[in-house]
């Protein structure tokens, strides 16, 4: 761990330093704290950096001066990630040119780009770090052994982000289970969940969400899709809603990786989920409220709401939807329609494969996995501009975040593109870390927490030396 001495000209507001779940409390990663840094590198504006053993793409969460994150340590070698989204497809094309049959091609792709359960023995850890220093307060091993399913080499075995209510940390790992710990690291309970196959052994990623006394999860897999609620005090299942969505013929793509969203709107509070080809919203007892067909077969971006509308990214080649509160039944758009009584607008070319958009200062900023960046009016759906961040922007998995009139886009190589908020595209600068990056950052008061493959960084605007 590296630690830099800082001069603090005041006390940070403790309440502003809470980041309780994936993408923050409102599932829209923005901040009004003007002290947050615009520039950083592995040496610039680094308050501290702490090496994190193993690998995990879960985001850090923050509560009461503590940071929590998960990781998996592998006995022996593990397949390292590789940037980009098309390299497996390119490999398939190369093998097809060699005249290999489909079975042999699939065997070679699985051997090169996937890690299967029998190939690895894992130890799953929850880490607690001190927010001010980065020092490890404690770590707890909560599971071990061969994983219940495989992963694509770009995924991790702990891609789900924990959630906290300020009293306990709730850790969900897809196909493994739920675990609860207090802030001193004492395990409160554990609840195993059934293991179901994921499409082509891609692995899992959908994080849990919390509302009141319940933890909500979604498991869209190849065999038994479901959404479920658990009592946060005991870990006991409260309800389960089985789902049957996605393709039933051909590729049978029935898996998804989206994190659900608790939408507290003027009509009611509901659990919004996005699965293969279909989005479904439930009330908090598991009763279906509405559904929308027309999303991608393998969705990854997560829904969120701001300004009275729910924003739902349909995925690559699909629309971006803005949904009004109070929807009921099937709200699918008719052929050629862009809106209806429940859907305020759609932007047909703005669905993307991986990153979730961010809403900031009246606009949605949409980042595609290849670096195409768009601004859309959040109220009307009007496209303001669409631009390429840079001719050599690289590939993007991390969702953008925003503060201080800037939008931040972190690519998989660790380079952040800083774009001015507003109606005209303006790239202000880039910040380089030179480390593989796929975890969405956390914002804690005046600190930006960025997790790379090897390290957790706390970036903070440097003050005058003491």
Regions found by a protein language model. Name each.
Residues 16-466:
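Noncatalytic, solvent-exposed loop/strand surfaces
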Residues 8-16:
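Hydrophobic h-region of N-terminal signal peptides that target proteins for export
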Residues 1-9:
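Sec-dependent signal peptide recognition
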């Amino acid at each position: 761990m590296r630690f830099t001495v800082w001069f603090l000209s005041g006390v940070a507001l403790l309440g502003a330093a809470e980041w309780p779940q994936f993408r923050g409390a409102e599932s829209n990663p923005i901040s009004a704290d003007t002290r947050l840094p615009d520039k950083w590198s592995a040496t610039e504006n680094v308050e501290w950096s702490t090496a994190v053993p193993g690998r995990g793409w879960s985001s850090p969460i923050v509560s009461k001066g503590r940071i929590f994150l998960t990781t998996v340590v592998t006995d022996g070698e593990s397949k390292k990630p590789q940037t980009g989204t098309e390299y497996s497809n390119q490999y398939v094309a190369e093998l097809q040119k060699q005249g290999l049959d489909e079975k042999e091609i699939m065997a070679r792709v699985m051997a090169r780009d996937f890690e299967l359960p029998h190939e690895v023995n894992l130890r799953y850890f929850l880490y607690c770090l001190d927010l001010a220093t980065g020092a490890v307060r404690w770590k707890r091993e909560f599971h071990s052994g061969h994983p219940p399913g495989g992963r694509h080499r770009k995924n991790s075995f702990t891609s789900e982000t924990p959630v906290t209510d300020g009293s306990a940390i709730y850790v969900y790992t897809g196909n493994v289970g739920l675990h609860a710990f207090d802030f001193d690291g004492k395990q409160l309970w554990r609840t195993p969940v059934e293991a179901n196959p994921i499409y082509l052994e891609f692995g899992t990623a959908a994080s849990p969400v919390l509302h009141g006394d319940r933890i909500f999860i979604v498991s869209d897999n190849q065999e038994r899709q479901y959404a479920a609620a658990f009592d946060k005090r005991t870990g006991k299942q409260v309800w389960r809603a089985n789902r049957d969505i996605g393709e039933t013929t051909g590729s049978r793509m029935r898996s998804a990786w989206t994190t659900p969203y608790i939408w507290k709107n003027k009509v009611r509070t509901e659990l919004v989920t996005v699965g293969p080809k279909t989005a479904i919203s439930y009330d908090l007892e598991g009763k279906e409220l509405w559904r929308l067909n027309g999303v991608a077969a393998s969705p990854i971006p997560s829904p969120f709401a701001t300004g009275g509308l729910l924003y739902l990214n349909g995925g690559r080649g699909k629309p971006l939807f803005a949904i009004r509160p109070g929807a009921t039944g099937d709200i699918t758009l008719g052929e050629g329609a862009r809106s209806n009584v429940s859907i305020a607008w759609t932007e047909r070319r703005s669905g993307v494969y991986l990153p979730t958009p961010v809403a900031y200062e009246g606009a949605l900023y949409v980042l595609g996995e290849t670096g195409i960046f768009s601004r859309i009016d959040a109220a009307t759906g009007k496209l303001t501009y669409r631009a390429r961040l840079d001719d050599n922007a690289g590939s993007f998995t991390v969702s953008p975040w925003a503060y201080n009139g800037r939008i931040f886009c972190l690519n998989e190589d660790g380079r952040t593109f800083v774009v001015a908020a507003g109606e005209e595209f303006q790239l202000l600068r880039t910040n380089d870390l030179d480390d593989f990056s796929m975890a969405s950052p956390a914002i804690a008061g005046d600190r930006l927490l960025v997790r790379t493959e090897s390290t957790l960084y706390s970036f903070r605007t440097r003050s005058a030396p003491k």
